[in-house]
A protein has these predicted regions:
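N-terminal catalytic cores of secreted or lumenal carbohydrate-active enzymes
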Residues: 1-20, 24, 32, 39-47, ...
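Conserved, mostly hydrophobic/aromatic
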Residues: 22, 117, 186, 232, ...
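Carbohydrate-binding surface patches
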Residues: 237, 252-296
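Conserved beta-strand positions
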Residues: 24-27, 71, 119, 151, ...
Length: 299
């Protein structure tokens, strides 16, 4: 914890970059992430996470640092709600960290620790019924303990069979729309107040927004953007920090309310926001194979 505090203070002093947030663990519940040198998981039980966070909190308080300490960068939403491919010591994370009855792991009254959970959207994106249901369950558990949520990492994985899995860079709208649908569900159903993509630049895989083509000497090359990058920009360019999401209701041509009409997983999906400066942003996704017409009212 002294090392982390030294890093946060040192970077701000040397480079003028202030860390508003830091998370000391990445995917502590990801059993697949702990073997070999190619992944970056940091295996830990809930008790180990809680002990480390409390020690880090004490160090920050002693140094009068206001950097916020985040938990828990879960590899899978299911580990936040219950156990998934690991035991109870790494599961039920929302309850473990933010229910006062969890005396060994409760962090709700720990200085510099916001009532906020971080999780990764991997592996719960298919089938479409699971995409929605899992995020509704997550939101229900978060609301029960008055906890906020950030989606802090995801990309295309092998289970995303609708677009051929993760292999092979895709510059087309196919992957762009697929990811936009995930963003929509994470924000609208899970209530994510922040959303991050895994990687900016990569090779022949669907994890990069930009594809790099490096020359053999590794000294030069070229880059190519993707529609995915621009799809993400439809959110990040227009929805600014401090924005508030607005409810969206959909009506048919006769004026009848369409239940759940803001989310047609194979058609139109709509979310709306008001920025801190009073401006509005509306993000519309058309997953259908044909053009759609609509009218925006009361905005």
């Amino acid at each position: 914890v002294r090392f982390l505090a030294d890093v946060v203070e040192g970077v701000e002093k040397h480079d003028g970059i202030k860390f508003n947030y830091i998370c000391p663990f990445n995917e502590p519940d990801g059993h697949w992430n702990w073997v070999g040198p190619k992944q970056e998981g940091s295996p830990a039980t809930n008790r180990e996470v809680a002990r480390t966070v409390r020690l880090l909190s004490r160090e920050f308080v002693n140094r009068k640092m206001d950097t916020q300490i985040m938990v828990n960068e879960s590899s899978d939403y299911r580990c936040m709600l219950r156990t998934h491919q690991t035991d109870w010591q790494r599961g039920y994370q929302i309850q473990a960290f933010f229910c006062p009855d969890s005396v060994d792991t409760y962090l709700g009254d720990t200085p510099n620790v916001p009532r906020l959970m971080l999780g990764h959207s991997y592996w719960t994106t298919t089938p479409l019924s699971e995409l929605r249901a899992m995020r509704c369950q997550l939101r229900e558990a978060l609301d029960k303990y008055n906890v906020g949520f950030w989606q802090s990492e995801t990309c295309i994985m092998g289970n995303d069979e609708e677009i051929g899995g993760g292999h092979g860079f895709d510059r087309t709208m196919k992957t762009a729309l697929y990811v936009a649908r995930i963003i929509h569900h994470d924000i609208v159903y899970a209530g994510a107040k922040s959303w991050q993509w895994w990687r900016a630049i990569g090779g022949d895989y669907k994890d990069g927004l930009i594809r790099e083509y490096t020359n053999d000497d590794l000294k030069d090359g070229r880059v190519e953007d993707s529609k995915l990058m621009w799809a993400l920009g439809n959110y990040s360019r227009f929805i600014r920090p401090g924005a508030v999401r607005l409810s969206v209701s959909a009506f048919d041509q006769a004026g009848n309310l369409i239940p759940g009409g803001d989310t047609d997983q194979k058609g139109l999906m709509c979310s709306a926001y008001q920025n801190a400066d009073g401006s509005y942003a509306v993000v519309l996704i058309n997953y259908a194979q044909e053009d759609k017409e609509l009218s925006l009212i009361h905005i």
